A protein has these predicted regions:
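Structural and coupling elements of P-loop NTPases
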Residues: 1-692
Length: 692
């Protein structure tokens, strides 16, 4: 069944890991006939957590789509991971969602995940409501949870439901404030109306009056009616609430239990009645054919355009998940990829329900679906009609902040790892990797240790390669501290033409990181045509220092004398001679190891400042300054040796309960302390022995 854009809702579930987002999606599917049984994440049988890694770990790793059909509307529920390592999946979902539901637990109340979700919605000006989950579980406390939300997010959060407890403080139902009715959940999660308990009638009146006041503030007409003492009609209540949600002046709060189905149907009603359709949602920014910045709002009658917001690429094939921004999509359409300029022929179209792909003949404007086998299309691409090429804004993925070295357990499988990483990177753009020739390691950088562990597991399960993780080697440098003069003489007689090259070199500290090569030869002691060979020999030599084999920097090398043989001298002989001089002279020039220093910018709430500064001191860091960001956080700038930053992403997350973030960039090299030099030299020797 197809739906017009007015009857589509694209809603992402956000919140802390373990708060019940996947269970809520499962409840919505089950109660609307989308599934025949209610899945449970702990049993590994849910629609949204279908990946083997998700089933094994009992957490969401990827965003999954759960299309829910309810009261003539299609609700595309985007179930996102709550663990911070998989924040890229959340960013993808937010790019195409028209509203969000922030899920908070009645057992835990306010959480870091809810704070982060709220902030992400604020940055995008995304309409949202809050759902307090697990209200019927032991040790749950709805009132305490609501109070923490009100304290953190302000008086604009408005409860449209409230739980009903029995004498033993067990939740048995809920009050629907908007309709002034009460319900309990039946054995299959169905909604059964009950009388509003006498002790809840004052609560209902109080909540309804508060809701009326919030509605009155959405328009002058409703405000006048409110102050005249007139009651609002149901239509006016819906109109006001819908407007308040749209302009971000009102954030409804719903409660329930995904397991029992309590409150799920009311949540569906709220989604349909109050949350915006794609026509009313946040416009996407981008560029038109002339390169001008423009806003793009879904419009059914326009030429087709779609955003590729997610990619799934596994052993079963490749699906490019899209949101139709304008027009509609049909198989075999010819659309331009704005990134490459190439025209792409669309493959088969699908509506996804978890891993299940249902083929459709058309994707309507505003809808979310997938295109099969688009091998040259990547996440973030815009596909549009050649007559009106559109390029939507890139998806703002987080920068990698945690790096590890990946090594195959069986030698010779490096290419297999690289091929696997290429495929995995199609699905997850929050990590990258490089083959570091200097440290002889394949270094993968991403968001955290859990993400790296998942990558390792998928390399084994999907591509059959066993790998292990280790800390990346630090790219040290070497320099000298004093001037030396030394001879390098290469003489070899093998019958016939021999080999002869003789140079006198002066090595001294230089002014620039790159090698400074000079010549001061007088009288033709070394002919000029051999100067390039001497310089080439030096540039090859400085790649490996004499202390630990690291590149040499800040070196000035001057050729000032030497001798040659008219027959036996050659470019190769002089190149060899200067390298002999290098190996002889550099140990005499007081070589020292340099370590890379980076600029660290940490954003943290004020309350964690002491812990973070204490931790930086242990890392040999130097705090350079602090500035408030206007949101109750401090931005602290520091300089820290790169060698001390290996697990900083994990440690900062632990110190701040996930509230801290940071950026780190290399700025310069400086002398390493003696203990660091000694350790690095020993490690380099061990690495060389292993290579030999």
């Amino acid at each position: 069944m197809s739906y017009s854009v007015q009857n589509i809702r694209n809603v992402c579930l956000l919140g802390h890991g373990g708060n019940g987002k996947t269970a809520l999606a499962e409840s919505m599917l089950y109660l609307t006939g989308g599934t025949v049984r209610l899945g449970n994440p702990a049993d590994g049988n849910t629609v949204c957590d279908y990946d083997p890694e998700e089933i094994r770990r009992q957490i969401s790793i990827s965003t999954a789509v759960a299309p829910v059909e309810y009261n003539g509307c299609k609700i595309n529920v985007l179930d996102t991971p709550g663990y911070f390592d998989f924040s890229g999946e959340v960013i993808e979902a937010l790019q195409v969602a028209d509203a969000a539901i922030i899920v908070c637990s009645a057992k835990a109340g306010m959480s870091v995940g809810a704070e982060k979700a709220w902030k992400l919605c604020e940055q995008r000006r995304l309409p949202r409501l809050l759902y307090i989950s697990k209200t019927d579980e032991e040790n749950s406390d709805y009132n305490a949870a609501f109070d923490t939300l009100r304290e953190r997010f302000g008086k604009n959060i408005a409860p449209v439901a409230a739980p009903i407890w029995d004498a033993d403080k067990k939740v048995i139902g809920f009050i629907d404030v908007l309709h002034k009715r009460a319900f309990e959940a039946g054995p299959k999660g169905e909604r059964i109306e009950i009388d509003v308990p006498d002790d809840k009638k004052p609560v209902l009146d109080e909540l309804y009056d508060a809701l009326k006041e919030s509605v009155a503030e959405t328009s002058e007409e409703l405000m006048d009616k409110y102050f005249s003492g007139e009651d609002f009609t149901y239509a006016e209540m819906i109109q006001g609430l819908r407007q308040g949600v749209k302009d971000l002046s009102l954030f409804p709060v719903v409660c329930g239990s995904a397991v029992s189905g309590l409150g799920t149907r009311m949540l569906l009603d709220i989604i349909v009645e109050l949350l915006p359709s794609p026509l009313e949602g946040r416009p996407l920014m981008g560029e038109n054919a002339d390169g001008e910045v423009d806003e793009f709002v879904p419009f059914p009658g326009a030429l087709p355009a779609a955003l590729v917001w997610k990619t799934v690429s596994d052993q079963y094939g490749k699906y490019s998940f899209v949101k139709v921004i304008s027009g509609n999509l049909k198989p075999d359409m010819q659309l331009v990829n704005s990134r490459t300029g190439a025209t792409e022929k669309l493959g088969r179209l699908y509506v996804m329900k978890g891993k299940k792909a249902e083929e459709v003949k058309e994707l309507e404007c505003g809808d979310i679906g997938a295109i099969g086998k688009m091998e040259k299309v990547k996440t973030g691409d815009t596909l549009s009609d050649p007559r009106k090429v559109v390029k939507l804004e890139p998806i703002p993925f987080p920068e990698p902040c945690y790096s590890v070295a990946v090594t195959p357990k069986t030698k010779g499988q490096e290419d297999k790892i690289a091929a696997g990483l290429i495929r995995l990177n199609e699905e997850d753009l929050t990590f990258n990797w490089v083959n570091n020739a200097e440290t002889r390691q394949m270094v993968v950088s991403g968001t955290g240790d859990m993400q790296m562990d998942v990558i390792l597991s998928r390399l084994k399960s999907r591509f059959g390669v066993d790998a292990e993780l280790s800390e990346p080697r630090v790219p040290y440098r070497e320099k000298i501290r004093k001037k030396v003069e030394v001879q390098g003489r290469h003489k070899k007689q093998t019958g016939g033409h021999g080999q002869f090259g003789d140079v006198w070199m002066r090595f001294e500290p230089g002014d620039t990181e790159e090698l400074q090569f000079c010549e001061e030869v007088v009288g033709g002691a070394v002919p000029k045509n051999y100067f390039p060979a001497v310089e080439k020999g030096m540039r090859e030599a400085v790649v490996h220092g004499v202390l630990a084999g690291y590149p040499v920097v800040y070196l000035k090398a001057t050729l000032y004398d030497g001798s040659y043989h008219p027959v036996d001298s050659s470019e190769m002989a002089f190149k060899t001679a200067v390298q002999i001089a290098y190996k002889t002279g550099m140990p005499q020039a007081s070589p020292v190891l340099l370590e890379p220093i980076g600029e660290l910018k940490v954003t943290i709430p004020d309350s964690y400042m002491g812990d973070v500064i204490g931790d930086l001191n242990k890392r040999r860091g130097r705090v350079m300054g602090m500035n408030p960001d206007g949101e109750g956080n401090q931005i602290m700038e520091a300089e820290v040796p790169m060698a001390e930053m290996g697990r900083y992403a994990i440690d900062l997350r632990s110190m701040t309960q996930g509230r801290g973030s940071f950026t780190f960039r290399f700025v310069r090299y400086e002398d390493a302390p003696p203990a660091v030099q000694e350790k690095a030299i020993e490690a380099a020797k061990a690495m060389q022995e292993e290579a030999d």
